[in-house]
């Protein structure tokens, strides 16, 4: 922080608050802020033992507020001139020009704390304090010779105008007073009153001493109040000269006769008025003393000497009085010289008026008159004296003392003459002598007087001429000496300038401005004080440069502000005011002169044209239309429901918040570059400058990276092609960037791009090589007949055995990674422990080949699946126990021949081990563990396929058994629905017919059922399989099979349970089973007797829910599977196959899981019963009815069938 001034404390001050400083008289202070006229913020200067200012003082107690009237600006050490131009490098330094006069306040040998002197030599300097290099400033005291010729000419002119004026200039610092014998001050100071003023005396070290200054009685005295120094008393006539400095400091120059060790006295008055009063009093007292010194005050002497002027030696123009003639014998005792008179050497002898003796009547003799005769010639020295010649007749008028007598000559003139020059005579002798010589004496006296006057004029002219010549010689000598000094000074400065300009010293020592700024900011501003209001802290605001400010006026002329122009921002000009505040004013509000000034700076026209005014009016009209159109929307919003209004209100609030965020981001901390002005200077259109400036500020671009910007970077920021060229040229011109730099930047960018391309190409070549090697191995294995099973996806390792990076975005990176090696000894111990553990009970399930689940997530190339942390089912499908056979009661009709047992399918083929080395280095250990596990046998019957609906019922029963266990379904991709047809295969490669969802046709092996009344070839009604299938999953407690197919329909009874009462002939009503199977319910006989011709017997039909031991066994088996799922052997097997912690729904599911989605079988029961017609037929064949039925009901019931009956 730069200092405003260096001041010195005038008085002691005790701080009244924590933010104030304690002051002691003569303490030096660095003034930091002086905006407030009554309180200044200052830092106390500390000195070390050698008197050098301490530069590293970081004590906060040295910064605070001080009263402005308790300090004054300190006196400089010297005045010096700058040898070279110097430009300030930091805020604490000061710029200076060559030959500029500087006031030096401090010096540490390397840096000088200075202030510019300015044009007024009596002022305290201009501007602020600052440091300059000591080797850039002349060490010698500056010689100011600029005003010497003017003073010389003025003195010459004044001398020519007043060459005859010999009065002494008592108001200024004139020539010293001639040495004369002074009378007593008591006599000189009569009538001179004493006046006193409170002042401070300054010693040789510029220390102040309070006291009282008094002037009067032809004396000047000073009484100190701070010490016991005796009162100094000086004659007013010993003050040779006096001057006033800075309006308050009185400088007195004393003559050697003062008898003091100091030749000068300095007093500091409290105000300018008091200083002026002191000057006037000195001049008045000095004039009174000089007048009193010239008064005829006789001084008695014991031995009178010849009369002589006391100051005859001071000037050659005053002649010495003639020596007295020898005393006559008769009057030897009276022949004494006159006493010494105290006269002023600067006053000329009085001019006597020519008095005509004829005009003066002769004094009539009186008897009481005493006559005398002049014994010597006497020249009058004062106005009251009388000039007499030897032997002149005189009349003695008074004898007031023994030294001087008052006489009258024959011409009637009166005056005083020395008593020793006059001899008294008697009256008769005087009368006789005077009667004859009166006329001759009068004529001789007149001639003598005229001669004396002429002689005096000639002598005065001679003296004046000699004085002028002497002064001219003195002036020439002074001019010559001054020229020699200036020549020597010029030669010395030229010699210094001829040397190379030294480098500025390093900033090794400098006042700790950081501590000063911090301490200054911590100063609190007290409130409610009786003392003056404290200045506000303005340290955080930077002030504009005074050289760049100007007066700005608005269009009305009512407001004016002095500020510095910073640039444009969104159609407004930015101004930096003198108090540090930055404001923005619209251009159209500025006066025409300011707009013209801005146009000269920017080179663009800123006054709006007619087209722009019309466009602005059109925009205003458009905005008005938009506001009017938005009003119906507001009314529409008011008519919305409450929920819609709330949503609309939230939407508006979110828009407002977003607008505020943008405004806060736009009004954030400003960077040191005004990008708007930058683009404007580059020639970019004003409308685009704002957008480009916001882009640069958003991307944190500053001046340090401007030289490295290339067209591609500017294009990515959003600049247009033409603006890119303009900005590039402007950057090259402003920062002197040559073409080689641009080419080097482009070459670097292209080199980086080429390097990246080469690295990508190398990686791609390696990946292609690896892929080609794998394809070659697969092709070779295929030619050899080997089946190579792809390596299962690993959770923690990749295909090459390296650990995967299982970290994903959003999860913390693990601090340490586990080793990729597996301890074989630990696995062997685990294997033995598993071998000793009891083998779990074997489970019977439908045998199906193990199908590796297909990866549906991200590829292994990504290193980690997106769903790696979701639960997953085990890789091997748990075996399902065989469903227990539910025994059904024998029907009353002859039973059909039993179906032969289903053929045992061949065992599943074991995958041939690949000849290629295992992809996972731990696969061998996991295979050993899998080999120790007991294999579970599974048997799956192969359902047959009926080629046509006309096959025998026996074949149908062998080909399809609805109660038999079903094979597993094919795996379902994650992105497909569950109701797609699942077609798994057995080891033989043949398809197993599985049905899920709603089918458009009936299952293989099931006969079409005809409904209605058949008129021709009507056969007995076939049994219908009805019941509810568990499709919703909520009835899984009843078992995976849901409701068993139940047989309903007509039996062979006689009509409605009565034999022989039906018009139809046929068998009897067969026993029908209703109720819950396995719950102890007895079968109920329902239905009709056969009522048509050629009707065959109806087989036993089963109805009801099957919830016997089969469902209980399924529940127990599910619980046992859930317990064994988390055993160590199963977990190791899952980790080996890559199915650990995967979604159970993504793996192949159990065959019973989707039974709810299978269509319920309807058709023939074993026994060879033919299809039956129900209802009334109208000549249509059974096949036509079957087709109609299939067209009318293309889908099965959601519950897998419905109710089958004859009604």
Swiss-Prot record:
SH3 domain segment(s): 2-76, 77-142, 367-427
Function text: Component of the PAN1 actin cytoskeleton-regulatory complex required for the internalization of endosomes during actin-coupled endocytosis. The complex links the site of endocytosis to the cell membrane-associated actin cytoskeleton. Mediates uptake of external molecules and vacuolar degradation of plasma membrane proteins. Plays a role in the proper organization of the cell membrane-associated actin cytoskeleton and promotes its destabilization.
One cellular-component annotation, GO: nucleus
Record note on quaternary structure: Component of the PAN1 actin cytoskeleton-regulatory complex.
Name of protein: Actin cytoskeleton-regulatory complex protein SLA1
Record's keyword terms, sorted: Actin-binding, Cell membrane, Cytoplasm, Cytoskeleton, Endocytosis, Endosome, Membrane, Repeat, SH3 domain
Pfam families cross-referenced by the UniProt entry: DUF1720, PH_SLA1, SAM_4, SH3_1, SH3_9, SHD1
PANTHER family per the UniProt record, alphabetical: ACTIN CYTOSKELETON-REGULATORY COMPLEX PROTEIN SLA1, FCH AND DOUBLE SH3 DOMAINS PROTEIN
Species in which this protein is naturally found: Mycosarcoma maydis (Corn smut fungus)
Superkingdom field: Eukaryota
Subcellular location field: Cell membrane; Endosome membrane; Cytoplasm, Cytoskeleton, Actin patch
Residue stretches of biased makeup (Polar residues): 542-551
Classification via Gene3D superfamilies: SH3 Domains (2.30.30.40), SLA1 homology domain 1 (2.30.30.700), Transcription Factor, Ets-1 (1.10.150.50)
Disordered: region residues: 143-185, 325-367, 448-553, 609-667, 736-757, 773-919, 936-979, 1175-1207
GO biological process terms held by the UniProt record: actin cortical patch assembly; endocytosis; regulation of actin filament polymerization
Regions of compositional bias (Basic and acidic residues) in chain numbering: 465-496, 531-540, 619-629, 641-665, 773-786
Coiled coil location: none
SMART domains given in the database record: SH3
Disulfide bond positions: none
Biased composition (Low complexity): 742-757, 818-853, 877-890, 909-919, 936-952, 1183-1192
Gene: SLA1
Ranges of biased composition (kind: Acidic residues): 151-169
Family of the protein in this entry: Belongs to the SLA1 family.
MF terms (GO), sorted A to Z: actin binding; identical protein binding; protein-macromolecule adaptor activity; ubiquitin binding
């Amino acid at each position: 922080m730069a200092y405003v001034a260096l001041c010195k404390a005038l008085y002691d001050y005790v701080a009244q608050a924590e933010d104030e400083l304690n002051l002691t008289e003569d303490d030096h202070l660095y003034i930091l802020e002086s905006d407030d006229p009554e309180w200044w913020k200052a830092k106390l200067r500390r000195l070390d033992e050698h008197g050098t200012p301490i530069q590293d003082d970081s004590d906060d107690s040295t910064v605070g507020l001080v009263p402005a009237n308790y300090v004054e600006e300190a006196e400089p050490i010297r005045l010096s001139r700058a040898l070279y131009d110097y430009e300030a490098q930091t805020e604490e330094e000061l710029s200076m020009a060559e030959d500029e006069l500087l006031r030096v306040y401090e010096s540490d040998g390397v840096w000088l704390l200075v202030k510019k002197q300015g044009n007024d030599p009596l002022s305290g300097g201009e501007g602020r304090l600052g440091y300059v290099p000591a080797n850039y400033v002349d060490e010698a005291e500056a010689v100011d010779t600029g005003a010497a010729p003017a003073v010389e000419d003025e003195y010459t002119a004044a001398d020519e105008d007043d060459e005859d004026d010999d009065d002494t200039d008592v108001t200024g610092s004139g020539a010293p007073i001639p040495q004369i014998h002074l009378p007593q001050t008591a006599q000189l100071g009569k009538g001179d009153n004493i006046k006193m003023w409170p002042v401070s005396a300054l010693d040789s070290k510029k220390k102040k001493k309070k006291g009282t200054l008094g002037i009067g009685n032809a004396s000047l005295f000073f009484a100190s109040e701070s010490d016991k120094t005796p009162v100094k008393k000086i004659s007013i006539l010993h003050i040779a000269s006096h001057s006033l400095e800075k309006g308050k400091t009185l400088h007195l120059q004393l003559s050697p006769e003062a008898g003091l060790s100091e030749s000068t006295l300095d007093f500091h008055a409290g105000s300018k008025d008091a200083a002026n009063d002191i000057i006037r009093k000195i001049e008045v007292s000095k004039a009174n003393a000089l007048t009193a010194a010239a008064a005829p005050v006789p001084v008695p002497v014991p031995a009178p000497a010849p009369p002589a002027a006391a100051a005859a030696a001071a000037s050659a123009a005053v002649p010495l009085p003639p020596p007295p003639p020898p005393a006559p014998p008769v009057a030897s005792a009276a022949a004494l010289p006159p006493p010494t008179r105290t006269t002023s050497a600067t006053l000329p002898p009085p001019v006597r008026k020519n008095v005509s003796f004829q005009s003066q009547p002769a004094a009539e003799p009186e008897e009481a008159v005493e006559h005398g005769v002049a014994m010597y010639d006497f020249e009058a020295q004062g106005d009251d004296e009388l000039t007499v010649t030897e032997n002149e007749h005189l009349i003695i008028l008074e004898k007031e003392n023994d030294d001087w007598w008052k006489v009258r000559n024959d011409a009637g003139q009166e005056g005083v003459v020395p008593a020793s020059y006059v001899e008294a005579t008697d009256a008769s002798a005087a009368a006789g002598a005077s009667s004859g010589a009166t006329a001759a004496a009068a004529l001789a006296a007149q001639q003598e007087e005229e001669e004396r006057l002429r002689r005096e004029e000639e002598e005065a002219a001679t003296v004046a001429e000699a004085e002028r010549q002497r002064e001219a010689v003195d002036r020439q000598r002074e001019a010559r000496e001054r020229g020699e000094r200036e020549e020597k000074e010029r030669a010395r400065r030229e010699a210094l300038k001829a040397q190379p300009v030294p480098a500025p010293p390093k900033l090794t020592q400098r006042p700790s401005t950081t501590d000063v700024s911090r301490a200054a900011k911590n100063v609190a501003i007290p409130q409610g004080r009786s003392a003056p209001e404290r200045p506000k802290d303005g340290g955080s605001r930077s002030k504009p440069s005074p050289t760049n400010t100007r007066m700005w006026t608005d269009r009305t002329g009512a407001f004016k502000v002095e500020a510095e122009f910073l640039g444009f921002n969104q159609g407004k000009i930015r101004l930096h005011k003198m108090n540090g505040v930055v404001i923005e004013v619209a251009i159209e509000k500025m006066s025409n002169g300011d707009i013209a000034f801005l146009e000269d700076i920017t080179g663009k026209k800123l006054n709006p044209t007619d087209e722009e005014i019309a466009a602005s009016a059109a925009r205003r009209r458009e905005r008005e239309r938009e506001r009017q159109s938005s009003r119906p929307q507001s009314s529409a919003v008011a008519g919305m429901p409450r929920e819609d209004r709330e949503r609309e209100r939230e939407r508006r609030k979110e828009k407002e918040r977003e607008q505020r965020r943008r405004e806060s981001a736009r009004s954030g901390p400003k960077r040191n570059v005004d990008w708007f002005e930058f683009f404007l200077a580059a020639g970019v259109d004003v409308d685009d400058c704002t957008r480009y400036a916001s882009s640069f500020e958003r991307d944190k671009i500053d001046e340090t990276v401007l030289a490295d910007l290339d067209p591609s970077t500017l294009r990515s920021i959003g600049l247009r092609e033409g603006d890119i060229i303009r900005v590039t040229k402007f950057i090259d011109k402003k920062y002197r960037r040559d073409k080689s730099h641009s080419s080097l930047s482009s070459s670097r960018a292209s080199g980086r791009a080429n390097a990246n391309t080469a690295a990508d190409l190398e990686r791609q070549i390696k990946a292609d090589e690896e892929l080609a090697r794998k394809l070659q191995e697969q092709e070779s294995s295929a030619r050899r007949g080997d089946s190579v099973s792809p390596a299962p996806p690993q959770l923690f390792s990749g295909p090459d055995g390296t650990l995967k990076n299982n970290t994903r975005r959003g999860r913390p990176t693990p601090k340490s990674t586990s080793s990729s090696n597996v301890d074989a000894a630990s696995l062997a111990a685990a294997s033995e422990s598993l071998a000793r553990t009891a083998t779990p009970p074997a489970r019977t399930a439908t045998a199906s080949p193990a199908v590796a689940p297909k990866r549906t997530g991200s590829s292994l190339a990504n290193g980690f699946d997106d769903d790696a942390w979701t639960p997953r089912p085990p890789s091997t499908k748990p075996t399902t126990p065989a469903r227990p056979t539910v025994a059904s009661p024998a029907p009353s009709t002859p039973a059909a021949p039993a179906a032969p047992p289903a053929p045992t399918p061949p065992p599943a083929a074991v995958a041939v081990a690949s000849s290629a080395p295992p992809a996972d280095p731990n696969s061998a250990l996991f295979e050993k563990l899998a080999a120790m596990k007991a294999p579970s046998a599974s048997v799956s019957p192969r359902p047959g396929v009926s080629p046509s609906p006309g096959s025998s019922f026996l074949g149908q029963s062998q080909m399809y058994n609805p109660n038999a266990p079903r094979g597993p379904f094919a795996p379902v991709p994650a992105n497909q629905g569950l109701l797609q047809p699942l077609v798994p295969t057995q080891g033989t490669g043949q398809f197993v017919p599985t049905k899920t969802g709603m089918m458009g046709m009936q299952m293989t092996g099931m006969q079409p059922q005809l409904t209605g009344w058949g008129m021709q070839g009507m056969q007995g009604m076939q049994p219908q399989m009805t019941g509810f299938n568990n499709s919703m999953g909520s009835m899984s407690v009843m078992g995976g099979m849901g409701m068993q197919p139940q047989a309903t329909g007509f039996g062979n009874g006689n009509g409605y349970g009565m034999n022989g009462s039906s018009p139809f002939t046929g068998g009897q009503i067969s026993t029908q089973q209703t109720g819950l199977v396995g719950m102890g319910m007895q079968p109920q006989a329902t239905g009709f007797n056969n009522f048509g011709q050629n009707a065959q017997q109806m087989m036993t039909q089963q109805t009801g829910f099957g919830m016997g031991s089969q469902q209980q066994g399924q529940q127990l088996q599910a619980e046992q599977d859930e317990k064994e799922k988390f055993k160590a052997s199963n977990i190791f097997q899952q980790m080996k196959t890559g199915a650990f912690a995967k979604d159970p729904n993504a793996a192949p599911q159990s065959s019973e899981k989707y039974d709810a989605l299978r269509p319920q079988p309807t058709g023939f029961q074993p026994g060879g019963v033919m299809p039956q017609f129900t209802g009334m037929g109208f000549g249509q064949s059974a096949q036509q009815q079957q087709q109609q039925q299939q067209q009318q009901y293309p889908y099965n019931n959601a519950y897998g069938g419905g109710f089958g009956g004859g009604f």
